[in-house]
Regions:
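Iron-sulfur-associated redox domains of electron-transfer enzymes in respiratory
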Residues: 1-172
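Local cysteine-cluster metal-coordination motifs and their immediate loop/turn environment
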Residues: 46-51, 124-134, 177-196, 230-243
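Generic marker of "main functional regions" within proteins
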Residues: 63-67, 79-82, 137-140, 186-195, ...
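Homeobox/homeodomain signature
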Residues: 117-120, 187, 222
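Ferredoxin-type iron-sulfur electron-transfer modules in oxidoreductases and energy-metabolism complexes
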Residues: 148-177, 191-243
Length: 243
């Protein structure tokens, strides 16, 4: 229930193809390398992914003519950890996650019997603040979308703005202290697409993995924030992949 993005180049390999409610990855960034291949690459994009794809077109990082975009309907993407957080253990199968399924409840088969979980309670956090179900770019549309927004997109922003400078500094210091510098956020971010990344240089302390709470080691996040400011499409991939 944690499917990984993959390229399929033969008919035989397509037997391994999976696309269901657990396929939450934003595939637009993968089209940077796909644009360098001969011929067209078919890619499945959710509504929120198309914002990222359009941004990459503006930055000349992807070739629109090299992509055949299947706009896939979305009713929110699922997070297996959200299901486990409900206390369900020994999961063997999950029914209701197929994109053609419109059920409001997931049926979870376990070693200890059958359990049920509300679909909305198993969604990725970003889906609760979804900015819309309209595909901004596509060649073909399949499946139906369903509105999932049930929370204020700017509630956390308002909370931070209400803090004093000291409280705000403490808040961010606490959040960034959790970072293990695995680079997952950078690697998955569509806005982080430089051919050579500053964080791959050994000349900067910010290129090393964090081993203490020092401010300098948190420069990784400060630099990344400045680099993607004005280009971030709020796809939520950084939060999804962060361990």
């Amino acid at each position: 229930w944690n499917p990984e993005p993959a390229y399929f180049e033969t008919e035989e390999s397509l037997k391994e193809f999976v696309y269901d409610g657990f396929c939450g990855a934003n595939l637009s960034k993968y089209m940077i390398e796909a644009s360098k291949l001969d011929g067209k690459t078919l890619v499945c994009l959710k509504p929120c992914d198309t914002y990222s794809f359009n941004q990459l077109i503006k930055e000349h990082r992807v070739d629109r003519e090299k992509a055949y975009i299947i706009g896939v309907g979305c009713r929110g993407k699922l997070d297996i950890e959200k299901i486990r957080e409900t206390g369900i253990k020994g999961i063997t199968d999950i029914k209701g996650a197929q994109i053609e399924n419109e059920a409001d409840t997931l049926t979870v088969e376990t070693l200890y019997g059958e359990k049920t979980v509300e679909y909305k309670d198993a969604m990725l956090s970003r889906c609760h603040v979804c900015k819309g179900k309209e595909h901004k770019i596509y060649d073909e549309l399949i499946g139906e979308s369903r509105e999932t927004k049930d929370a204020d997109r700017f509630a956390e922003v308002e909370m931070i703005e209400a803090m004093s400078p000291e409280e705000r500094f403490a808040f961010f210091r606490k959040e960034l202290s959790k970072c293990i510098r695995c680079n997952a956020c950078r690697n998955v971010c569509p806005a982080c697409s430089c051919r050579k990344c500053v964080f791959d240089s050994t000349k900067f302390d910010s290129a090393q993995k964090a081993n203490s709470d020092s401010f300098e080691e948190k420069m990784f996040h400060i630099i990344r924030a400045f680099h993607v400011a004005g280009r971030c499409t709020d796809c939520g991939e950084c939060s999804r992949v962060c361990p």
